């Protein structure tokens, strides 16, 4: 019998962004925020918050697209999130990482670097696909060219596969799951404040949604429930403990 707590859900697109924005606003002080892996836009509404936003991305084309489209970064850094020196230690109040970890071979190393970049008690906002869902299982086995075709013709994203645009190659380390994140937090003294599963990908009456829902239910049944069909992605708000850096011996 599973000991995992019941998963709260995000049933409408952008509902988790509203939740996360509210949590960050409640911090009630000037903030240093890092977007670790830059998307093409910034989904959080932090109106009224005094904050400085830094963006880090290994893909210079993606970073340049963000700068040209939004112009909202106070600082832009080209760097590898899994490299220890990329993120300054204990600098940020909030680190936002959205659908990036699945693209990094050393996902745990990158996550440790992010936690090290947080001030004690800082918040990590993490959005990942669940490798133990039907969606994640399928993505892990789909050839990359087919993944691009899916985005271009099924999701109807015309820029799919172009430089700086999704989808990007994926690795789906074991960490990229409910069990993986909970184990990581338990080992590293972190507290999970929010854990939400995204369900809106199988909600609605559109033909594409109905096809997706039928496929997800069927594969979940074949797996005897080992693969979840009700959610595809996960959102976490994680609080760093009050201890020092992770993954290194204390510096005297």
Describe the residue ranges of each PLM region.
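Short amphipathic alpha-helices and their capping/turn segments at secondary-structure boundaries
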Residues: 23-25, 112-116
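Generic enzyme active-site microenvironment
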Residues: 33, 55, 100, 125-128
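Active-site micro-motifs of SAM-dependent methyltransferase domains
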Residues: 83, 102, 133
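Helix-to-beta-strand junctions that scaffold the AdoMet/dcAdoMet cofactor pocket
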Residues: 104-105, 118-120
């Amino acid at each position: 019998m599973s000991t995992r707590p019941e998963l709260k859900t995000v049933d409408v697109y952008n509902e988790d962004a509203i939740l996360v924005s509210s949590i960050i606003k409640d911090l009630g002080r000037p903030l240093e925020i890092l977007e670790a892996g830059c998307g093409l836009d910034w989904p959080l509404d932090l109106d009224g918050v005094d904050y400085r936003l830094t963006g880090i991305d290994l893909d210079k084309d993606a970073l340049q697209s963000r700068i040209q489209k939004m112009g909202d970064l106070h600082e832009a850094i080209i760097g590898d999130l899994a490299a220890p020196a990329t993120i300054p230690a204990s600098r940020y109040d909030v680190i936002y990482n959205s659908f990036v970890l699945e693209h990094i071979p050393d996902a745990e190393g990158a996550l440790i670097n992010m936690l090290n970049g947080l001030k004690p008690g800082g918040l990590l906002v993490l959005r990942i696909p669940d490798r133990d869902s039907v969606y994640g299982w399928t993505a892990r086995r789909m050839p990359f060219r087919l993944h691009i075709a899916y985005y271009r013709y099924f999701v109807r994203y015309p820029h799919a596969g172009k430089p700086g645009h999704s989808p990007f190659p994926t690795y789906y380390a074991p960490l990229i799951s409910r069990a993986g994140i909970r184990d990581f937090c338990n080992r590293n003294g972190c507290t999970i404040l929010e854990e939400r599963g995204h369900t809106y990908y199988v909600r609605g009456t559109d033909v594409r949604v109905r096809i997706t829902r039928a496929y997800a239910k069927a594969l979940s049944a074949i797996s005897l429930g080992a693969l979840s069909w009700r959610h595809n992605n996960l959102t976490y708000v994680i609080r760093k403990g009050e201890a020092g850096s992770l993954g290194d011996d204390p510096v005297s």
